[in-house]
Amino acid sequence: MAKNTTKKITSIGGSALIEGIMMRGPKRTTVCVRTAPDKICNEDISINTIPSKCKLFKLPFFRGIAGLIDSMRLSYKALMLSADKAIESTEIEEEPSKFEKWLDDKFGDKLVKVMMVIASILGVALAVGLFFFVPSFLFDLSANVVPAFKGDGGNAVFWKSVFEGVLKIVLFLLYIIVCSQMTEMKRVFMYHGAEHKTIFCYENEEELTVENVKKQSRFHPRCGTSFMVLMLIVGILVGLFVPVAPFGIGFLRPVFKILLLPISCGIGYELIKICGKHDNAATRIIAAPGLWAQRITTKEPDDTMIEVAIEAIKAVIPEDGSDIVSK
C-alpha cells in the first residue's frame, strides 16, 4: 500500500454523484454537474449541521455520529440536485406511456423527488434486513450443524459476532462489485476516482490541472468506503457485548445491534481521522481493508470528469486556509 506523503492535509471532502461531484469545505459545499460536453453546472447547497445546534457533537466519538448523519443529509440533497440536472440535460425522444403521463399529472416536477424518497426508504429497509437480520438468521440455521454455534454462552456470542461480521463484509463487497458492473455506476465510480485524485493534487500543493490530477492516487484514506469497512470491522467487536438471545429472544439481537450502530460509527470515524493524519505501520494496517475496497468503488476517471472535480474543489477552498488540518 502506498504511503500517504502529501505535503498538507485538508478537511475538504466530497462524494461522487450522477455525472458530477459534491465537494464540502469548512465554509461552503458545492455541487458540480456536467450538463453538456462544454458546460458544468455549479450550485451551492447547505444544511443546518448537528454540531452547530449541539456542542456535544463537536467532541471526539460524538462528532462521528453527527458527521455520518450530516453527510447522509448533504449527499441526499446533492444526489437529488444532480439527478435533476441530469434529467434536464437529457432529451427524451420517446412518447411517454400512459402510466408515465399519470405520474406526471399527479406529481409534476416533484416526481423525481418522490421516486428518490421511495427508493431511499426501500434501500434502507433492504440494508437493515440484509445486514442485520439475514446474518443472524443464517447463523441460527448453521447452529443446527455446527456444535460450536449452539447455546447462549460466551463461545456462542463470539462465533455469532464473527460469523455475522464476516458475512456483512462479504455482502457489502458483493454489493459494490455488482454495482460496479452497471454502466451508470461505473461512471459514478469514475467520478469518485476523480474526487480523490483532485483532493490529493491539492494536498500535494500542485497546480490543479488535468495533467497534475491524473498522476495522483485514486485511493484516499479519508473515504466513505474506508469508513464503511471500518464500521463493519468495529461492529464485530461491538457484537461481542450483545447476547445471542437478549432476554431469551433471539430476534432482539439484531435490534440491539442496530441500536448500537452509533458506537461503531463513532469509533470508525475517529479511526479514519487518525489514519488520515498519521502515516505509520499501525495506521497503514487499519487503513488497508478500506483502501483495498476502494479498488472497487473508484475507477480511473477521464479528463471531463477531472475537470468537474477541479471546478468543485476550487469552489470550496477557503482563502484563509481554514481547511488545513496539518502541514
PLM regions: where:
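Hydrophobic alpha-helical membrane-embedded segments
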Residues: 59-81, 164-189, 261-277
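Juxtamembrane "helix exit" motif at the C-terminal ends of alpha-helical transmembrane segments
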Residues: 124-150, 231-256, 269
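Alpha-helical transmembrane segments of polytopic integral membrane proteins
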Residues: 82, 131, 135, 139, ...
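Divalent-cation
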Residues: 1-90, 94
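Hydrophobic alpha-helical segments characteristic of transmembrane helices
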Residues: 92-146, 156-182
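Transmembrane alpha-helical segments and their cytosolic interface motifs
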Residues: 110-129, 216-241
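Polar-ligand-bearing catalytic/cofactor-coordination segments
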Residues: 2-17, 21-23, 91, 150, ...
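Hydrophobic alpha-helical transmembrane segments
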Residues: 155-169, 248-263
